[in-house]
């Protein structure tokens, strides 16, 4: 089997699981272009997010308050993961699908 060159490798979300580490909700694991795996814990178990409460106005306030977290341009960071998985779509499944698309296209505009 031929190996892909380093240039053709991209960051890839490998798994999203409930976190076993308190106080986090989820753990996202990524395969990085250098061949290493990186896991990030994010979300707080004791607090609601958009996938739980479904309040659009509350979601918009969260996005306004946390837009600065996206300045890092690093989708592995907890702020990115919270914004695009917990506060993006009404379901985690829908948000995860959108996050994978954004990761593929490198499109990090604010959720609408």
Task: Show the residue positions of the predicted features.
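Extended terminal accessory/targeting regions
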Residues: 1-112
């Amino acid at each position: 089997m031929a190996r892909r060159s380093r240039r053709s490798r991209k960051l890839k979300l490998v798994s999203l699981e409930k976190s076993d580490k308190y106080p986090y909700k989820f753990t996202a694991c990524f395969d990085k272009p250098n061949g290493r795996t990186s896991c990030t814990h994010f979300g707080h178990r004791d607090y609601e997010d958009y996938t739980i409460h479904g309040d659009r106005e509350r979601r918009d306030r969260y996005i306004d308050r946390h837009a600065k977290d996206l300045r890092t341009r690093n989708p592995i960071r907890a702020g990115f993961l919270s914004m695009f998985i917990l506060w993006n779509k009404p379901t985690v499944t829908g948000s995860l699908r959108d996050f994978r698309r954004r990761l593929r296209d490198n499109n990090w505009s604010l959720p609408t």
